[in-house]
Amino acid sequence: MLRTALLAAAGSPACRSLVERTPLTRPVVHRFVAGSTVDDALAVTANLIGSGRAVTLDHLGEDTTDPSMAAATVKAYAELLTLLADHGLAPDAEVSVKLSAVGLRLPDGDRVALDNARRICAAAAAAGTTVTLDMEDHTTTDATLGVLRELRADFPWVGAVLQAYLRRTEQDCRDLAYAGSRVRLCKGAYAEPASVAYPDKSEVDRSYVRCLRVLMDGAGHPMVATHDPRMIAIAAELGKDRPDWEFQMLYGVRDAEQRRLARDHAVRVYLPYGDEWYGYFVRRLAERPANLAFFLRALVTR
């Protein structure tokens, strides 16, 4: 019930206004968000790479309904990618892109998002790195996978995210478990109806393991996005005889575990930055009770 309430709050303009106006919120947000500027993001990226971890950067923003904002997001990614190359970080730092941030919600959104994603992929290719398409709520899944297919004709290294809580995802994993494919498997963090998503955690966990087996048995590059100790152990066992896979974890979550895993496995940190942090932040609170406890404890003790 608490998770449902928090996910509802993630889409509430009134809740957003209240949280963003609270002076004590921003210092806590910085546990999960690198900062507001590209310089903030570059500094944290360099530190993470120096610790033996790779990075995927997310310029925060979603559900854009203004063409100028979508264009600004593309420009921000192009600037970021140029700077990653200039600072020698591109070999270990890619970007993650939400299609709703680059025009998917606009009229003729599939075309607009594809054109803008192409521009970002071209900038990534010039920088010597890659792009992963983030997955959002289930209404965008088909459109996102359609854009993925189009992009991979010119940029075969483009990755995608699949969410284990959706009932369709095991088949999507089968469809994408081919040579050259990069798939980030996560559990999912949006409020979804039971008609399309498993409502119980135990069902989501079982789905995650089924999907993980499909990806590990396939010819692609699995990207195992989880903080769950049980899923980490299962992934390590399933992947022990193959080198071409990685763990992915969120910035600010289980840092010590990230460092431990990085001693024996490839680990990539999902690193968001920018001013549009509200939706991302609230979904992180909803995912793990420990995150919410940290937030409330920080507010009380400041």
Features from the language model and the residues they span:
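Positively charged, amphipathic and often flexible ligand-engagement surfaces
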Residues: M1-R302
